[in-house]
Amino acid sequence: MVNPTVFFDIAVDGEPLGRVSFELFADKVPKTAENFRALSTGEKGFGYKGSCFHRIIPGFMCQGGDFTRHNGTGGKSIYGEKFEDENFILKHTGPGILSMANAGPNTNGSQFFICTAKTEWLDGKHVVFGKVKEGMNIVEAMERFGSRNGKTSKKITIADCGQLE
């Protein structure tokens, strides 16, 4: 089985910035990968398209995926509101790692973050389920609109998204 690849077309205040593609590690965390894949395609009738990156901290991460409240308090999974931490096999080894944001153990919904540095203190707390395949330069460009408290200076949105393979 080949791991799925999904893409985000990123916009800044409505202007296209570029495409980021992700490999999803369905071989290691099938349930978590499937949630992100289906939210990227929108095939369940809801998902990431049109949502924003509400929290960007340069040198740390870019967080998004709250398509219900758009501020970090919402979002939902394809399995219902929240689902369990599948496993912690994969680690936060460096830039480009894709991991689930949460509010404590077993509270995965739709929020995720893209690491822009090694974040080993998150190992065992957040489920890593993918990595940037192409477009890390776009993630680095997104970082420039972040701040130390995470507030973004411009609206960073997922203008389009879907599955490539």
UniProtKB/Swiss-Prot annotation:
Modification after translation = Acetylation at Lys-125 markedly inhibits catalysis of cis to trans isomerization and stabilizes cis rather than trans forms of the HIV-1 capsid. PPIA acetylation also antagonizes the immunosuppressive effects of cyclosporine by inhibiting the sequential steps of cyclosporine binding and calcineurin inhibition. Acetylation at Lys-125 favors its interaction with TARDBP.
PTM annotation (N6-acetyllysine): residues:
28, 44, 76, 82, 125, 131, 133
Q: Which residues carry this modification: N-acetylvaline?
A: 2
Residue list for modification Phosphothreonine: 93
Q: Which GO terms describe its biological process?
A: activation of protein kinase B activity; apoptotic process; cell adhesion molecule production; cellular response to oxidative stress; endothelial cell activation; leukocyte chemotaxis; lipid droplet organization; negative regulation of oxidative stress-induced intrinsic apoptotic signaling pathway
Q: Which GO terms describe its molecular function?
A: cyclosporin A binding; heparan sulfate binding; integrin binding; peptidyl-prolyl cis-trans isomerase activity; RNA binding; unfolded protein binding; virion binding
Question: Any idea which residues bear N-acetylmethionine here?
Answer: 1
EC number(s)? 5.2.1.8
Q: Which UniProt keywords apply?
A: Acetylation, Apoptosis, Cytoplasm, Glycoprotein, Host-virus interaction, Isomerase, Isopeptide bond, Nucleus, Phosphoprotein, Rotamase, Secreted, Ubl conjugation
Q: How is its activity regulated?
A: Binds cyclosporin A (CsA). CsA mediates some of its effects via an inhibitory action on PPIase.
- Which residues are in the PPIase cyclophilin-type domain? 7-163
Reported effect, residue 121 to A:
200-fold decrease of sensitivity to CsA. Reduced ability to stimulate MAPK/ERK phosphorylation
Q: Which family does it belong to?
A: Belongs to the cyclophilin-type PPIase family. PPIase A subfamily.
What does this gene product do?
A: Catalyzes the cis-trans isomerization of proline imidic peptide bonds in oligopeptides. Exerts a strong chemotactic effect on leukocytes partly through activation of one of its membrane receptors BSG/CD147, initiating a signaling cascade that culminates in MAPK/ERK activation. Activates endothelial cells (ECs) in a pro-inflammatory manner by stimulating activation of NF-kappa-B and ERK, JNK and p38 MAP-kinases and by inducing expression of adhesion molecules including SELE and VCAM1.
State the name under which the record lists this protein: Peptidyl-prolyl cis-trans isomerase A
Source organism per entry reads Homo sapiens (Human)
UniProt lineage: Eukaryota, Metazoa, Chordata, Craniata, Vertebrata
